Amino acid sequence: MADNEILQMHDLKPAPGAKKDRTRVGRGEGSKGKTAGRGAKGQTKRNHVRPGFEGGQLPLYMRLPKLRGFKNPFKVEFQVINIARLVELFPEGGEVAVADLIAKGAVRDNAPVKVLGDGETTVAFTLKGVKASASAKSKIEAAGGSVSED
């Protein structure tokens, strides 16, 4: 290419020695023929063994017991929050809904919320749209608050 010509896309090519063909094995004696890197005679020369095969030994997946029971697809998993955390987030108390907890980053909006009774409170909470354990309910009501699940 002359110095005054403009370099164009169709003129580009890889540098010499930059591209090397992959070795094609088993294509004749002159180029890795015969055993083609598979070693001498035997099972793995002729074919492959399936995943989990242990050479005829009783495989692990058959030695272990079968799984029993079932998983309930309708199980409800609650996000839990303790009274101590509620007091941290809302020190003044007042009405607390699930949306307020989501806004503060305490829970996510993908599962229902349950309040547990770890911690103490002296401020009154009015909790809306959450479940509460018996101990949490008694502590909140003792402080002058209330819990409603709707």
UniProtKB/Swiss-Prot annotation:
Protein keywords: Ribonucleoprotein, Ribosomal protein, RNA-binding, rRNA-binding
Cited InterPro entries: Ribosomal_uL15, Ribosomal_uL15/eL18, Ribosomal_uL15/eL18_sf, Ribosomal_uL15_bac-type
Region ranges (Disordered): 1-55
Molecular-function GO terms, alphabetical: rRNA binding; structural constituent of ribosome
Pfam families: Ribosomal_L27A
Record has Protein biosynthesis as a keyword: no
Residue stretches of biased makeup (Basic and acidic residues): 8-32
Family: Belongs to the universal ribosomal protein uL15 family.
Summary of the function given for this chain in its UniProt record: Binds to the 23S rRNA.
Protein's UniProt name: Large ribosomal subunit protein uL15
